[in-house]
From Swiss-Prot:
It is an enzyme of class 4 (lyase). Signal peptide: none annotated. Gene3D superfamilies: Jelly Rolls. The keyword Lyase applies. GO terms for molecular function: ectoine synthase activity. Catalyzes the circularization of gamma-N-acetyl-alpha,gamma-diaminobutyric acid (ADABA) to ectoine (1,4,5,6-tetrahydro-2-methyl-4-pyrimidine carboxylic acid), which is an excellent osmoprotectant. Its EC number is 4.2.1.108. This is L-ectoine synthase. It comes from Hyphomonas neptunium (strain ATCC 15444). Keywords: Lyase. GO terms for biological process: ectoine biosynthetic process. Belongs to the ectoine synthase family. Pathway: Amine and polyamine biosynthesis; ectoine biosynthesis; L-ectoine from L-aspartate 4-semialdehyde: step 3/3. Coiled coil: none annotated.
Length: 135
């Protein structure tokens, strides 16, 4: 059984900070679950251009409001607490948090991330094999 406390893990190297967001990676590849699980905060007013070419992601909004735009269709969806979206086609997208407050999101990645990934210029994490080959 794996038990982790967000309030404690936020103070460890499981917390990753970047421009416009921070994330606490509660489950990673080494945990052997077949997916990774993160609590991610999108900073108020952030606009993030992302494209997870090598991962599928599902996201559930717990706090805050914003929107996600599917760059293939141009369709924009409002995000608020209780809304889930899934990037089931490695969808290129723009995620926006409204200016008033951050959004707190619960995120699941498949395949799981290792915890060492950083977003590339294209907004993607590298494939696990590419990450291992660069180590």
């Amino acid at each position: 059984m794996i038990v982790r406390d967000l309030a404690k893990e936020i103070l460890t190297d499981r917390r990753v900070d970047s421009d416009g967001w921070s994330s606490v990676r509660l489950l990673l590849k080494d945990d052997g679950m077949g997916f990774s699980f993160h609590i991610t905060t999108i900073h108020a007013g952030a606009e993030l251009h992302m494209h997870y070419k090598n991962h599928l992601e599902s996201v559930f909004c717990m706090e805050g409001t914003g929107s996600i735009t599917d760059l293939a269709t141009g369709e924009t969806h409002e995000i608020r607490p209780g809304v889930m979206y899934a990037l089931n086609k490695n969808d290129k997208h723009i995620l926006r948090a409204n200016a008033g407050a951050p959004m707190m999101m619960a995120c699941v990645f498949n395949p799981p991330v290792t915890g060492k990934e950083v977003h590339g210029e294209d907004g993607a994490y590298p494939a696990d094999a590419a990450l291992e080959n660069s180590a």
